[in-house]
Amino acid sequence: MFFPFSPSNFVSRLFLAVCAALLCLSSSAAAAEGQKSLTTRGELPWTLNADKLVSLEDGVIVEATGSVLLQRGEDYMKADFARYYTTTNWIFVQGHVEARMGRDMLNAAEAEFDLTSRTGWLKDGSIFIAGPHMYVTGEKVDKLFGDRYLFKNAKVTACDGDVPAWSLAAEQAEIEIDGYAKLSHTTLNILDMPLVGSPFLVLPAKTTRQSGLLMPDFGYSSLNGAFFSVPYFQVIDESRDLTFYSTYMSRAGFMPGIEYRSHTRDQDKTWLAFDFLYDKHKFSTEKGDRINDTDGKVNTNEERFWLRGMGDGFVGDSGWRYRYNLDYVSDQNFLRQFRDMRTGFNHSRDALYDMFGRDLQEVDKNRVSEGFVYRDWDRFMVSLGFRYEQIPYLGHGNTPHSEDTTVQRIPLNLYLFKGRMLEELPLELQGEVSSAYEYRAKGIRGLRTEIHPELSLPVNLPGASMLLTGGIRQTYYNSTHTELVDSQRWTRGGGTKDRFIPDMSAELFTQASRVWEMPENHLEATAENVGRTSWTGLRHRVQPRLTYAWTPEKDQSENPIFEEMDRIKPSQRLRLSFTNILTARRETVSGAKGNYKTGTSYFDPVRWEIATGYDIDEAERTKYRNLYGRRPWMDAYSYLELRPVNWLSLWNRLYVSMYGEGITRSDTGATLSNARWGSWSVSYSTRDKYYNYLDEMKRDNLSDMRFTSPQRLLTNTFTFRPWSNISLYYRTQDNIETGKNYERHFAIGYYHQCFHLIGSIQNKARDNSYRVILELPGLNF
């Protein structure tokens, strides 16, 4: 039907159309407002949740208000308000913005991101890097591709809180997560107060091991003057690294050093280090020796160094393995002069023991380098190696190396491991064949070969066990000749020699025990008992042991002396011992609500061994009786360990003369510890001049005897934490016999959340040192 046009009809229809459109928009908005979740577009969509969602412009824009959460997997974004652009996959967030994108933790007042590329910007933004515990903030932050950020007016710190103890302010900072932070026009602030500036600075922003400068070490030493050390750590790969040390000492000069570590697998590891010093303070008389001016030694060399290291591993892909220790030093004073420096003896010794479980020689002993390759089969092993022992004072103005009487060794060993000869018999064989070329610059040198088979027979008796052992030792020497001087060991035994020495031993052992049950001490697994501990049983064991060992007297004075085993001393001894062991069964309640449990463990609070013996050879001794009379009854021996509670341990080793001469040797120690307050350890050791007379009286002649001066050594170590962030340390070691102090060391440490400050004063030998150490945990420069 046709309707003629009229103004009134047109206005009416236009009004109806507008009302219909408004009604439609109102209905759409109302529907959106009723929703609280939507999913974004794309292959990896996000889920948007909020208290209120509103669609605008036909769904092109979605506004979210209240508890906004945008989430995809482990990535998320939280805010008070969000505006999401559906066609471009961009989102604008505002108000208490918190986000995680990959490894990045972000905070901002407002931000805008491309959800596809994860790029964007932040206003008043910050990121937190968990690995080094680093905060980076800026007025304007651009998030670039990957894990890179560009900060304007940046602030970098590892400290929690609004006013950090230290921070770095920069006009611009470029940060890459698990990479580096590059700062330009930087200022170091202490409590937000500027201290010192730098035009450019690079920091690691890594969550893994990173290359970079380590914290410096500085202080003052009366021997070396003011010192300053800056190490640089270089990561080679996940299993290897290098550390370069630059140490300057005002009295000694510049000492560079390098340390290499490798640990590719559990049984394949290496640690090597080398320090070098061009020292202008050489001296040609002992009066110029600042370390020890009473030993008669000098040092005329300017090039000083120390090479040390250890290694274990496999030779290629074969079944052959190797092991070596390196320890070679330029002079007798190097280790003592720099023992407490960052690359000194104490640091190297601890590092090697932690990595290999092996120790260096004491600082004042000869240096020993040795190594060998070996192959281990089921019952057979072959090894070939070397051993070099260095006397550090030789050369550089002292006794020349041509006068060195120390034995250097190239050994070959064949081992036959312990095993039964016949399955039907319990008889077991253990054998060793060894051969070595023994070299010394001055004195007898030559080939030493030894065969040492040994048989053992375990015997089960009623209520006891017995072990019988017997062996022979056949040794051959083929040595050079030199003029014999009886008091000089290195001149003895030229030509072809041999010796044959049998040995045997018998050991009788039994055990008796008794158990006391304490059911009344049982702890129920309840909330009231959580953390409580109780003894619920005791077992006492007594282990008597009687041993007899025999090695006949054999004249070996015509043989060379390359090692201590070239003088096997005669021995015919009986020893009786009783070992008491108290074992406690302990119950402890642990767990959380609804899952309490009672655990059981065992420990030995008391262990006590007492023993004495009789030396048959000593009873018949005719040599040196004018020097020291016969004493066949061996010292009464006692060794006691007490660990009744977790916070207390005591131990004592005691030797008492059976001839009324009192204590000949003792070692006593105690430790009290508390996880909150600290600990105290004390040890006391004594030695009588003749405490080891039984061995010394069997030497070839008087010149071979070594009796030590009486000693009484007291060591105290205290650690005290009056507050959780302050620690005090004190250690002292004194020889009570001579009144001489060997060491005094005091240190105080302040441990803040984002820095550690440690100061120490140490007096050791002739060196008084003062040191300040600043540590920034998790952060290197």
Residue ranges with predicted function:
Residues 2, 29-30:
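Alpha-helical interface/anchor segments and their boundary "cap" residues
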Residues 49, 78, 169, 741-744:
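Short, surface-exposed coil-to-beta transition loops
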Residues 13-26:
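Bacterial N-terminal signal peptides
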Residues 31-145, 230, 234, 342-347:
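Post-signal-peptide, soluble extracytosolic/periplasmic N-terminal scaffold domains
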Residues 1-12:
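N-terminal secretory signal peptides that target proteins for export/translocation
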Residues 104, 110-120, 127-150, 154-156, ...:
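Outer-membrane beta-barrel proteins and related beta-barrel translocases across Gram-negative bacteria
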